[in-house]
Swiss-Prot record:
Protein name stated in the entry: Replicase large subunit
Binding site for ATP: G833, V834, P835, G836, C837, G838, K839, T840
Domain of life of the source: Viruses
Pfam families, alphabetized: RdRP_2, ToMV_Hel_N, Viral_helicase1, Vmethyltransf
Domain ((+)RNA virus helicase C-terminal) ranges: 964-1116
EC number(s) recorded for this UniProt protein: 2.1.1.-, 2.7.7.-, 2.7.7.48, 3.6.4.13
Coiled coil: none
Domain Alphavirus-like MT: 72-281
Keyword annotations: ATP-binding, Helicase, Host-virus interaction, Hydrolase, Inhibition of host innate immune response by virus, Nucleotide-binding, Nucleotidyltransferase, RNA suppression of termination, RNA-directed RNA polymerase, Suppressor of RNA silencing, Transferase, Viral immunoevasion, Viral RNA replication
Length: 1616
């Protein structure tokens, strides 16, 4: 132990001394990486060459003043005023950076040669020749152009491409590039210029009269003018000479003449008007007309150059409230003089105007006046007796040092000579030991004598003042003034005979105060400017013509009367109905009668839309002759189909019942298909159909069900073939999960490009050398698949359902008679039995195997029945009388027996109703018994997007028999069954209590070692099943997979903490889960849910009730009280009460146990202990496994204890864990999807649901790359981003499939108790480089803007840059008296669940909005197979698809995906309100709307682990949406707010104050306590244990509103 301690101490000392090589290497690597990043950042800035020779100090001045540029100093050109001349090019580039590239720009007095060299063909220079020097300067610019062209010619080069347009413009039309008129008289006329016009003025506004400047800008329609000029604040002090030290220049003023020159050089001077420059400096408003004015704003001062901009302002846009009636004084006097015979009141009326006023003030800071005082100096001429006085600025410290020192002199020593000697001594330098010690004060030596005189007089007067105070203002016969002048005369003698008179006249000495004044100057001087303009514009609101609308309403009246018999007629969309009838020329009364018949299922036809809406019915009733191409035509006539043999010869195969160019009723099913070989080499296009949802079914309901079943087989086959064709087209873009299901064979090399997991596939899709695609039935020999010469590749699928679909289609098509299925006249009996009632046992007891037939859905069930039937040793059940449904249909007609007396179908309700009807007809039976359970899981449509109307799901039967005695279920489960079934359910089981539940702390607790599970393991979701299998559990199935099975003991597990829609009180999945066991069931769950409540209720049952099997529940009624207030939100100020303990108590009640977790060192523990991780393919740089040590500042310690964690340090282990839990943990739930066609259908629903009808088609006249769109994007960007865009050469695109990976240092707090058992992974950020964002950012910004402008904002809110107040306004018109269903779709792992289908949907939306095809393809390739690199942690990996969290489309892409997902699953035409934000959604539907199985649809189509949750109040983006009688109020989640108060990353008190302000902004609505009761109900919906919380809401308001009190929530961590 001692040796270990010694070794540790020695290693630590070596590290401190720098002897640890590993630490030194890491530090060097970190230093190197930092240097590389810094240099790369500098390289992205615009480059400017500085050729003039300047000093090192001047180099530093230029670099610091213009950090936006990467300046290269060559020092190759000696010139006069080198720094100022070189800075002029920087100033020009800085001004041009403010202007959008390509916008028409006027350069006032500019250098046209500079613009030519930069290739700016959009700049026009106004260069008037105001003097000879201007002519010389213009000729010099021409010389520079000639010199440049001669160099190119000498080198055999041509003008570069970026300069060619500008040089061509100057060569062909030189007056377009430059003119020699003043800007006020410029005659340049732009040709076809669109967009805004800009101007720049670089050191040229001196010569433009300020009063003409605004009108000149307006004449050229200039939107903004940017200007730069030399100036100094000291010119405002009326100094006659001012130095500009940085550029070694100076201003000198003589009256109104202001001269600018460079010091230490023999150069020409520049003369300007001082008063004119002063107007530019001090004025704010520059009127241009009686309506418009240009407003000046200073931007920045750099190296003695002032930058400002002049913005064009339309005064008519001022709010009319600033207008007031006032009298124009000049107009008043004019009216009085010209019209004395009028009354005075008439003159007043003539002069009265409606005026708009505005004012501004500008402060000028005089930095050189800091610590300075103004000292008066005076002098007199002995010859002329002319008196002069001036004031100088002298160091305050110098003045009072002198005054304090000489004040100590005795009366005899206080002489002018002594004072001058002392002042000279402290100003002079001293040499000590050969080293010069300079004076502390740099005072001009020429002023020392005058200053000494002032100091002397000031001190003399101070002495006399002291004597006066001592003598109580009485000094004898002489007055104080006389004493003063006696002393002065004695001191000076006859040298200054008129000193007294001079001092009095100049007020140097104030006799009344007996003091000499030394003033302290103001550091700021304020200049005011005022704008007064006359209000002239007046616009009247046009009247609305409603006569046409009223006439249309009268026409629709009779039709609406017919529709009033519908159950939900009050929700009928009259506008849509009338528009559709008018555009399609459908009679409204006819359409109304058909709608009533269709909605009542009495029409004899079915429109397989999601809902038979008004618009779809009108479309179906459209006249056949006027139907557009592809529209539906309802006809009863038979159309002959060409011979099947002829179709096969052409490689085409017509599928039955699939909508396309022909309606379903026009098909005449051919009976020539005898075997599956006739499918061989059918073209893939003939099997792929798109418009599956536009089929019209006619005939009796059984016939319609049978047609729908045929179409479902075709749709399944179509989707599978489409996916195989897609794989053949793009083999390289297949992700790892897809590779496990499919295979691709290269015929030429006889090698599998993608090796399938299974072998001997019966079918596949063939790609020929002509790039044609055919379905082929495969054969095998010794070498593998038998191929043809024209075959290029073969794609196969491991899913055998396609082969069975082909076989079943072949059989069913043979059964059709004239295109119509035959309906059997056999009696159909439904045996509805409760779970465990012995349905299989009853079948075996009733069946006669010699003449009856048993059909079951699965192979295992068929083998089980045969085994039980033959258990006596006598073989009675064979494959001829006990079959699976698929086997019977595929091999129909091949067995010896074709007719059966009775048909028994086990679990028949799990089959498609049309399939059941076919089975009855094919068996030729007399009576059919269909055994099933109406309350258990029904048939699930596995083909995403295929229509299966609700009334098709009801099996048409002649008789229903019930079985209400369960042989399996214990008594407590039987008690639950009585709630679900009509009639009394009895049980024969001797077990009374069998169910129990256990709340586990988190998903990590469930593992085979610490939590072995007893019996059969079941889960609700596939993701939970996969999680258990990955942890080592075996024989795990979902509830749906074991329906009909029986087990002695069951362990039911739920690992998903988010709501699951199938776990509900009336869910069939819950019923199946509770009824699988005979002895015991234990439910392990991480969250409270309805099943826990059910089990707890069953655990409390008494033996008496279990013996009775009886449920007696009363009807609950709710008292309703009408609202008292109407209108807007009632506001009641919340009292500021409570203490810290209130917040702690509330948090502990809502999340018990979280505050007791000691998690400050969890990250350290994970790094120091052994850990085992399962990762996908990646590359790890183990040299990054030990992070470089950093000096960490101890943060403030919170007083409120929450589950918040300390900030993590990024490193290989942390980043890898985050990547495993995020990017490597994507679910796989989706079924068979025809990706391209289904995506197209989904996008159709998206546009129909959310976009206004008139904006559903993109505006082709608007370019996404317009100047306006670029301007809008640039306004949102920082200067650094714009600089990177300017540095990018645009020659080629960067690698769009390369991403960087990083993690957020602060873990995200969860509002649950999972922190007690899990180590939360950090959030990952996957992002592109800035160059890619700069390319696609403006593009997607414009696409987003177009999308949001097209959304129906009255019903839908896409939450982008919205405030809580805007959310309240959106939901404010909800009527609380109307019953509503509040729905939330909760999705786990939203970003990582997105796969190829999501990308296809999103790209299709962007494409329809106008996304250019080439860039769209580039963007698509960059989001398929992508490479992630984490340089900090040393990790590199590859992922497929997934949403990139740092992408330019992350937020809007997630928003449109969630909206598209909901539009594909829910009836959006009935929605009241809907809001979407990222993965959050909130929907308001009328009460009682029917919704599909959202989890099923989300799993199969969207790969989402989604749950549709019904609530009383909405929860959206961390806020509770409380709708009430007066409108809506949005409260920030108080529990989330308290959780943030436990933050452990607050650095210091300043950071804490910023944190408080941010919390105040989001929690401002808590100041209103009027709706605290509703907030309590909303919180209790989410957190069941939450107490009434008004006390804690008030406490939050109290602490957040007081910055001092808020500091008490934290203590200094360094003092702990």
């Amino acid at each position: 132990m001692a040796y270990t301690q010694t070794a540790t101490t020695s290693a630590l000392l070596d590290t401190v001394r720098g002897n640890n090589s590993l630490v030194n290497d890491l530090a060097k690597r970190r230093l190197y990486d930092t240097a590389v990043e810094e240099f790369n950042a500098r390289d992205r800035r615009p480059k400017v060459n500085f050729s003039k020779v300047i000093s090192e100090e001047q180099t530093l001045i230029a670099t610091r003043a213009y950090p936006e540029f990467q300046i290269t100093f060559y020092n190759t050109q000696n010139a006069v005023h080198s720094l100022a001349g070189g800075l002029r090019s920087l100033e020009l580039e800085y001004l041009m950076m403010q202007i959008p590239y390509g916008s028409l720009t006027y350069d006032i007095g500019g250098n046209f040669a500079s613009h030519l060299f930069k290739g700016r063909a959009y700049v026009h220079c106004c260069m008037p020749n105001l003097d000879v020097r201007d002519i010389m300067r213009h000729e010099g610019q021409k010389d520079s152009i000639e010199l440049y062209l001669s160099r190119l010619e000498r080198g055999g080069k041509t003008v570069p491409n970026f300069q060619k347009e500008a040089f061509d413009r100057y060569a062909e039309i030189p007056e377009d590039a430059v003119c020699h008129n003043t800007f006020q008289t410029c005659e340049h006329q732009p040709m076809q210029q669109s967009g805004r016009v800009y101007a720049i003025a670089l050191h040229s506004i001196y010569d433009i009269p300020a009063d003409e400047f605004g009108a000149a800008l307006l004449r050229k329609n200039v939107h903004t003018c940017y200007a730069a000029f030399h100036f100094s604040e000291n010119l405002l002090l009326e100094d006659s000479y001012v130095n500009l030290d940085e550029i070694n220049a100076c201003f000198s003023r003589d009256g109104d003449k202001l001269t600018f020159s460079f010091a230490s050089e023999s150069t020409l001077n520049y003369c300007h008007s001082y008063s004119n420059i002063l107007k530019y400096v001090c004025k704010t408003y520059f009127p241009a007309s009686n309506r418009e004015v240009y407003m000046k704003e200073f931007l920045v001062t750099r190296v003695n150059t002032w930058f400002c901009k002049f913005s064009r302002i339309d005064t008519f846009l001022l709010y009319k409230g600033v207008a007031h009636k006032s009298v124009d004084s000049e107009q008043f006097y004019t009216a009085m003089e010209d019209a004395w015979h009028y009354k005075k009141t008439l003159a007043m009326c003539n002069s009265e105007r409606i005026l708009l006023e505005d004012s501004s003030s500008v402060n000028y800071w005089f930095p050189k006046m800091r610590d300075m005082v103004i000292v008066p100096l005076f002098d007199i001429s002995l010859e002329t007796s002319k008196r002069t006085r001036k004031e100088v600025l002298v160091s305050k410290d110098f003045v009072f040092t002198v005054l304090n020192h000489i004040r100590t002199y005795q009366a005899k020593a206080l002489t002018y000579a002594n004072v001058l000697s002392f002042v000279e001594s402290i100003r002079s330098r001293v040499i000590i030991n050969g080293v010069t010690a300079r004076s502390e004060w740099d005072v001009d030596k020429s002023l020392l004598q005058s200053l000494s005189m002032t100091f002397y007089l000031h001190t003399k007067l101070a002495v006399l003042k002291d004597d006066l105070l001592i003598s109580k203002f009485s000094l004898g016969s002489k007055t104080v003034c006389q004493h003063v002048w006696d002393e002065i005369s004695l001191a000076f003698g006859n040298a200054f005979p008129s000193v007294k008179e001079r001092l009095l006249n100049r007020k140097l000495i104030r006799v009344a105060g007996d003091a000499l004044e030394i003033r302290v100057p103001d550091l700021y001087v304020t200049f005011h400017d005022r704008l007064v303009t006359e209000y002239k514009a007046s616009v009247d609101m046009p009247a609305l013509d409603i006569r046409k609308k009223m006439e249309e309403t009268e026409v629709m009246y009779n039709a609406l009367s017919e529709l009033s018999v519908l159950r939900e007629s009050d929700k009928f969309d009259v506008d849509v109905f009338s528009q559709m009838c008018q555009s399609l020329e459908v009679d409204p009364m006819t359409a109304a009668k058909v709608i009533v018949a269709v909605m009542s299922n009495e029409s004899g036809l079915t429109l397989t839309f999601e809902r038979p809406t008004e618009a779809n019915v009108a479309l179906a009733l459209q006249d056949q002759e006027k139907a557009s191409e592809g529209a539906l035509v309802v006809t009863s006539r038979e159309v002959e189909e060409p011979s099947m043999k002829g179709s096969m010869a052409r490689g085409e195969l017509q599928l039955a019942g699939l909508a396309g160019d022909h309606p379903e009723s026009s098909y005449s099913r051919n009976e020539e298909i005898e075997s599956l070989e006739q499918f061989h080499m059918a073209t893939a296009d003939s099997l792929i159909r798109k418009q599956m949802s536009s089929i019209v079914y006619t005939g009796p309901i059984k016939v319609q069900q049978m047609k729908n079943f045929i179409d479902s087989l075709v749709a399944s086959l179509s989707a599978a073939v489409s996916n195989l064709v897609k794989i053949l087209k793009d083999t390289a873009a297949i992700d790892l999960e897809t590779r496990q299901k499919f295979g691709v064979l290269d015929v030429a090399s006889r090698k599998w490009l993608i090796k399938p997991t299974a072998k001997s596939h019966a079918w596949g899709v063939v790609e020929t050398h002509a790039r044609k695609y055919h379905v082929a039935l495969l054969e095998y020999d010794e070498q593998g698949v038998v191929t043809c010469d024209d075959w290029r590749r073969v794609a196969v699928s491991s899913e055998s359902v396609v082969y069975s679909d082909m076989a079943k289609l072949r059989t069913l098509r043979r059964l059709l008679r004239n295109g119509e299925p035959h309906v059997s006249s056999a009696k159909v009996v439904l045996v509805d039995g409760v779970p465990g009632c012995g349905k299989t046992k009853e079948i075996l007891s009733r069946v006669n195997f010699d003449e009856d037939l048993i059909l079951v859905p699965g192979k295992q069930a068929a083998e089980m029945i045969r085994r039980r039937a033959n258990s006596s040793g006598i073989i009675v059940a064979t494959k001829d009388n006990v079959k699976t449904v698929d086997s019977f249909m595929m091999n129909f007609g091949k067995s010896t027996r074709c007719q059966f007396k009775r048909l028994f179908i086990d679990e028949g309700l799990m089959l498609h109703t049309g399939c059941v009807n076919f089975l009855v007809a094919m068996s030729l039976c007399e009576i059919a018994y269909v055994y099933g359970d109406t309350q258990q899981i029904p048939y699930i449509n596995r083909v995403s997007g295929f229509p299966y109307p609700a009334h098709f799901a009801k099996l048409e039967v002649d008789e229903v028999e019930t079985r209400r005695t369960t042989l399996r279920c214990p008594a407590d489960v039987t008690h639950y069954l009585n709630r679900r079934y009509e009639g009394f359910v009895m049980s024969t089981s001797s077990v009374k209590k069998s169910v129990s539940q256990e709340m586990v702390g988190g998903a990590a607790v469930i593992n085979p070692i610490s939590k072995p599970l007893h019996g059969k393991i079941l889960t609700f979701t596939q993701s939970d099943k996969e999680a258990l299998l990955s942890r080592g559990y075996s024989d795990v199935h979902t509830v749906h997979e074991v329906q009909g099975e029986t087990y002695s003991d069951v362990s039911l597990v739920r690992l998903t903490p988010t709501p699951v829609s199938i776990i509900a009180g009336d869910s069939p999945h819950v019923l199946v889960a509770l009824s699988r066991h005979t002895c015991s069931l234990k439910y392990y769950t991480v969250v409270m849910d309805p099943l826990v409540s059910i089990i707890r209720d069953l655990e409390k049952l008494s033996s008496y009730l279990l013996d009775m099997y009886k449920v007696d529940a009363g009807t609950q009624x709710q008292l309703q009280i009408d609202s008292v207030f109407k209108g807007s939100n009632l506001f009641v100020a919340a009292p500021k009460t409570g203490d810290i303990s209130d917040m702690q108590f509330y948090y502990d009640k809502c999340l018990p146990g979280n505050s007791t977790m000691m998690n400050n060192f969890d990250a350290v523990t994970m790094r120091l202990t052994d850990i085992s991780l399962n990762v996908k393919d990646c590359i790890l740089d183990m040299s990054k496994s030990v992070a470089a040590p950093k000096d960490q500042i101890k943060p403030l310690t919170p007083m409120v204890r929450t589950a918040a964690e300390m900030p993590r340090q990024t490193g290989l282990l942390e980043n890898l864990v985050a990547m495993i839990k995020r990017n490597f943990n994507a679910p796989e739930l989706s079924g068979i999807i025809d990706i391209e066609n289904t995506a197209s259908l989904v996008v159709d629903k998206f546009f129909d649901s959310y976009l206004l009808k008139e904006k559903r088609k993109p505006n082709k006249n608007v370019s996404l790359f317009s100047r306006e769109s670029l301007n809008r994007w640039l306004e949102k960007q920082e200067q650094v981003t714009i600089g990177q865009l300017a540095d990018f050469d645009f020659v080629d695109l960067p690698a769009v499939d390369q991403y960087r990976h990083m993690i957020k240092a602060q873990p995200k707090q969860k509002l649950d108790t999972s922190i007690q058992t899990e180590y939360p992974a950090l959030q990952t950020i996957v992002y592109h480089s800035k160059k890619i964002n700069a390319i696609f950012g403006p593009l997607f910004s414009e696409l987003t803007r177009q999308l949001l402008d097209s959304v129906d904002s009255s019903r839908f809110l896409f939450f982008t840059r919205k405030t809580p107040a805007q959310i309240e306004d959106f939901f404010g018109d909800l009527d609380s008296h109307v019953p509503m269903d509040v729905l939330e779709l909760d999705i786990s792992k939203y970003d990582k669940s997105q796969n190829e289908f999501h990308c296809a949907v999103e790209y299709e939306i962007w494409r329809r909005l106008g996304f250019e095809d080439f860039l769209g393809e580039v963007w698509k390739q960059g989001h398929r197979k992508t490479t992630l690199k984490d340089y900090t942690a040393g990790i590199k990996t590859c992922i497929w698809y997934q949403r990139k969290s740092g992408d330019v489309t992350t937020f809007i892409g997630n928003t449109v995906i969630i909206a598209a997902c909901l539009a594909s699953m829910l009836p959006m035409e009935k929605i009241i309100k809907g809001a979407f934000c990222g993965d959050d959604s909130l929907l308001y539907f009328p009460k009682g709307c029917e919704f599909p199985d959202v989890q099923h649809s989300a799993n199969l189509m969207w790969n989402f682990e989604a749950k549709l949750f019904k609530k009383q109040y909405g929860y959206f983006c961390g806020r509770y949406v409380i709708h009430h009688d007066r409108g809506c109020i949005v409260y920030y989640d108080p529990l989330k707010l308290i959780s943030k108060l436990g933050a452990k990353h607050i650095k210091d008190w300043e950071h804490l104050e910023e944190f408080r302000r941010s919390l105040c902004d989001v929690a401002v609505s808590l100041n209103n306590c009027a709706y605290y009761t509703q907030l309590d109900d909303a919180v209790r919906e989410v957190h069941k244990t939450a107490p009434p919380g008004s006390f804690v809401y008030k406490s939050l308001v109290k602490f957040l509103s007081d910055k001092v009190l808020f500091r008490s929530l934290f203590i200094d961590g360094s003092s702990c």
